C-alpha cells in the first residue's frame, strides 16, 4: 500500500539557524519549535515539513566545479534535490520576485515539460526545486512523459525567470507559458 503524502524532509547540518531562516524565507514558513540542536519548520497546517539537526561538526560537501554555482557536487551519493510545488504560475513568480528582492536567486530554471521549475541552493548547498505542475492532472503529465518530445529530452529546456515574469505580467496565458519547446 502506498503512503498518502510525503510528510517532511530532515537535514543534518552545521548551520541549523541559517538553514532554518533560509527555509522560512524561501518557503514562507515559520518555526514550530527550536532549540540549539533542533528546529521544526512548517508552511501549512502540518506540524512540520522541514527539520534541521545539528549534532556536531560535519564535513562540508565539496563545491561543484565550474559554472559559478554554489551547489553540492553531483558525483557524490545522497539526495540530489527536494522539490516543493506551488499552486499557480502567479504564486511561483511572486515567490521568485520576493526571493530575488532578498538576493536569493535560482541557479537554474527549467521547463521540464510536466513542471516549470526553479532550482535554488540552501546555505548547506543542498538543491531545492520550487515548481508548478504544467498539466491540469497527474495523468496528463504522465501521458506527456511518454511522448516523443520527452523521450528526446527528458530534462527540459532552460528559461530566463525574468523573461517569464515579463510575459506573465503582459498577460500571456499560462497555458502558453508552460508549453515546452
Predicted feature residues:
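Vicinal oxygen chelate
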Residues: 4, 11-18, 76-127, 132-141, ...
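N-terminal "first-domain core" detector
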Residues: 6-44
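Short N-terminal helix-initiation segments at or just after the protein's N-terminus
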Residues: 14-28, 53, 57-69, 94, ...
